[in-house]
Amino acid sequence: MKISKSLWSVMISILFYLTSAPPFVICSSLEVTIDNHSPSNLKTKGSLEQDKLSHQMINSIKLHGILLWVSMGFLMPVGILFIRMANKAHENGIKVKVFFYLHVIFQILAVVLATIGAILSLRTLENSFDNNHQRLGLALYAAMWLQFLTGVFKPSRGSKRRLRWFLLHWILGTIVSIVGIVNIYTGIQAYQKKTSLSRDSSLWTILFTVQVTCLVFFYLYQDKWEHFQKQRVVLDELDHQNNNTNGRNNQSIQVVTRNDHEQKVMVPQPCRKSNALVNLFKLI
């Protein structure tokens, strides 16, 4: 798919703004002017400034987590669901186009939000890359852009490179989506260790687990949707056959009932008195 010049210009302008903008969190200078204040007042002022900085840092961590949650935890998996739904709706050309463009839009939004989250992390947070969350996040960021570029520069249909491109795009997309979800869990754990807010981290873990469960359920459901439709057709045919069989059985039962009725209404034959000896001699 060829990306239009307007789309490229929008993305380049966004990235240029993000890289050239001032930091998201501007820390005030820590210089203290010594005047007639007492040492206790200076200590109180320093502690308040440290608390303010800590509060700003926590807000930056939360914003970073929300951006990456929406990007890799929601938009990217939903975009994968859209492209799979497009493959299922191959008989309807309109649905294929709608699902395909939804896939493209969701993936572009995911890349933009992940880029904002990465820049926020590099400019305002401590990035020593001494833990698994930061290392995995850096690798994911590189893989995500590689995946995006493979989606942009894809070969035309019928090309010899089409199969290799498809395998690369599919494998990268699957890995980035799964590892991105795992890294969100590691990010929640890192947030708990850094801020000691176990209540917030537990709530976020529960909410994210519920969301992932819903996405997995919908993925499995749409994957078996065609099978469910075929099973419903088979069941309808069986019900129709059973109804026809029951109808034929009812007709035969009515015939038998009519014959019995005819036997019942037959003209009775006149009977005569006889004894056992007469019957015995007739048999002999």
Swiss-Prot record:
This protein's UniProt keywords: Electron transport, Heme, Iron, Membrane, Metal-binding, Signal, Transmembrane, Transmembrane helix, Transport
The keyword Endoplasmic reticulum is annotated on this UniProt entry: no
Location of the protein in the cell: Membrane
GO molecular function: metal ion binding; transmembrane monodehydroascorbate reductase activity
Cofactor: heme b
Residues that, per the record, bind heme b 2: 103, 169
Pfam family, one: Cytochrom_B561
Membrane topology listed for this record: Multi-pass membrane protein
GO cellular component, one term: membrane
Cleaved signal peptide residues: 1-27
Cofactor note (record): Binds 2 heme b groups non-covalently.
Occurrences of domain Cytochrome b561 (ranges): 28-229
Transmembrane segments: 63-83, 99-119, 136-156, 165-185, 201-221
Amino-acid positions noted as binding heme b 1 in the UniProt annotation, renumbered to this chain: 64, 133
Protein name per the record: Cytochrome b561 domain-containing protein At4g18260
